[in-house]
Amino acid sequence: MSETVKDKVIIDEKVSTKGTVDYAEGAEYSERLSNHSSDFSQWYTDEQILHFMKKLGYENRTLYDIPEDVAYILKKMPELTLEDSFKILKDSIIYFKDDENIPHDQYEEWKRLVDLEDLDSKEGIDEYDSFDIRAFASAIKFHSPYQEVRAVVDPEDDPTIPVETFRAYFLAIIWSVIGSGFNEFFSHRVVSISLNTPIIQMFLYICGKAWAKTIPCWTITIRGRKYGINIDKPWTQKEQMFSTLLYAICQGAFYTHYNILTQKLFYHSAFSFGYQFLLSLSVQFIGFGFAGILRKFVVYPARALWPTVMPTIAINKALLGKEKHESGMSRYKFFFLTFFIMFIYNWFPTYIINILNTFNWMTWIKPSNINLANITGGVTGLGINPISSFDWNVISFNSPLVYPFWSYLTQYLGCILAALIVIAVYYSNYMSCQYLPIFTNSLYTNTGHSFKVTEVLDSDNKLDVKKYQSYSPPYYSAGNLVSYGAFICAYPLMITWSFIVHSKLLFNAFKDWALNLWAMRKLKSWVTMFKSDYRALDDYDDPHSNAMKNYKEVPDWWYFAILIGSLVVGIAVVEHYPTNTPVWGLFVCLGFNFVFLIPTTILQATTGYSFGLNLLIEMVMGYALPGNPIAIMILKAFGYNIDGQADNYVSNLKIAHYCKIPPMALFRGQCVIVFIQIFVNLGVLNWQISNIKDFCTPHQNAKFTCPDAVTYYNASVVWGAIGPKRIFNYIYPIFKWCWLIGACIGIFFGVWKRWGKFYPRYFDPMLFVGGMLNMSPPYNLMYYTSGMIVSYISQYYMKRHHLNLWEKYNYVLSAGFSTGLVLSAIIIFFAVQYKDTAFNWWGNTVPYAGADGVGYPLKNITDTANGYFGYAPGHYP
């Protein structure tokens, strides 16, 4: 064995496999080591390497199969002194405190190693401890402390790799036009299908490789500048990711199509294309402005993990990454293997054997038993079933291969509590809900029929009190009641929890914004804002931020200009067109997003979970603008899409940060794509309205019944025409108490976490209530139970006991299955479902037979004395 480790020696000693001792100075040693990175036995003892791999979780790796990330960490380790390493670990203990995504045993090991600095003499530090101190510090300094990041992200960058090329733009624009049009067209169908980002990544890879090989390297001169339609280089990883991110920005919700559909088809308001374009332009771009503010909180910091972006990076690495020879199948082969497996398998649950989709086997025992169907049914019941589905479309509903296990488990526990509350609400017959099915998302009348909102509106699409009094108030199923209650709880919970737990971060953020706005009084501040040498990353020292310092950052004023420009366009729309929408309503939406954006985006960046502000905007504006459904819809579009588009854009910024895509190139490209997307989506939408017979009607032959638009319309009537005052004060008074319940939960857990002696490390009340919110009709426990099993296997068992396999294949598996599923669904739709060629046999009909398939209420409305429940006609609130 080697001698005692000496202080201030970069790598104090090297024990070869023969036992001879060698010493080296840092730079020379690092160069020699980089030339032999595949044979670390020349520079470290076998025991040291195996010991460190075990510390990182690689239980089954050998010296002949060292993971790429470990090899890189060991390669960079000579650049750190022992003092440097101690400082890095001490800073990391503070920075990553309470970070659930850092393995607990790893964090405790950091603390143990840092405590060794207090020894009287550094010579008393054990050889292995000294090695671990440098190795862990090297992982943090030169790579990442997160296993998820090390699995798919390359720590180094080559700035000479082409990114913003003509071919990358051309392919991105073509596929964005195809994808946006396709997704818009089929988004209004009952069973919608879409071209998601993974499938487009595969198409981009095929097209990019073909372009590089077949298109001549000609140049085009524009205003004296030459542009090559092809370059004499292979299709690169950065071009692939750049094109992917341009497509990804148009995968966010094109929210204004709900406004246009409801106003044209349900409110019969003939607004011009100019109105549609300007409204869409304002709504789609206003979120970009907020994204610039969010960068320093959820893009640049290393703690902003963004687990949901890992599959996108994994596909890129699998398709174009250079893999070193390792045991087992390559990522490239594994991706296409999983793609073909899922492409074939998806035919069975989707078309051939539907019981694989909805495996409600317990209801088959007695199909007519309503109670059994209510509790265990997967169609209209709560889905309490340990083996509920074998369909990857259902299993992957909540991304079990992507969300951290602690995040998925917390959400699942929230789902279980929500199911128990639904049972309590239903079987206690709260507000006579037993006269309705237990778990549906429809609105009902007091006679148990579907609530038709047109029955209570006048010719101006406002509430007609006489019609309302002769018809019925709207009633919710028990499942919808609990879902709405959880949604209401989430808002005050988010505020109280965040301002207690993240008080310093939020205080500094709001202080920074206030000071910047106040500084705008001076000319010097405006000059500084327009400087070209914007250095936003100077305060960050992780490897990815350091690599990104090679590229110019997008100045704040670019985002500020888009925010102001979009707001001006929005004001012009609501003022010029007959929308009945006050300008101050836009500023209220901006204010709510200003308060909620940082907490909600931090939640998404660290846990993968997100929720929107749509219900909050509906309720607040319903109080402020009673009887004005058009205004509610417009303000809801702004209030929701600011958050939605900002989150979408900053997640793309984080991918660019990980993959070293120049920020200014991404900004330019995504602005161009969003502008094009507006024309494509509006063109497709207006064509559908004009050319598809019975479009958005319940009996449309091709099932283009617009379920989302109908829900949007119903919500505009309930919260806009009827109003939250009637709902909260009379029909469902429990809702108003949910605000207080949410605030109390946030205060209780916030105080406990910040000042309590012990707090469960992996418990986040926002995720728990978010899980309750997930349990929203028609998505019952069936959509989460099978995923819970997969999450345990992947994110817990495999990650803990087979980390080498998990790192190499987990996100590739997620991407391969997702890609195969989407392409298979498209083929199935056009081959058999579009022609309505049903495959009728027992395996396809039994899930929908009996009480679970129909959704019977527990009580029959005809058994009541008056033939209705609740308030008497003429006395409705």
UniProtKB/Swiss-Prot annotation:
Residues 189, 262-272, 356-374, 426-480, 575-582, 636-671, 752-766, 833-877 are extracellular. It is a multi-pass membrane protein. One of its GO terms (cellular component) is Golgi trans cisterna. It is found in: Membrane. One of its GO terms (molecular function) is oligopeptide transmembrane transporter activity. Keywords: Glycoprotein, Membrane, Peptide transport, Protein transport, Transmembrane, Transmembrane helix, Transport. Belongs to the oligopeptide OPT transporter family. Transports tetra- and pentapeptides. Does not transport glutathione. This is Oligopeptide transporter 2. It comes from Saccharomyces cerevisiae (strain ATCC 204508 / S288c) (Baker's yeast).
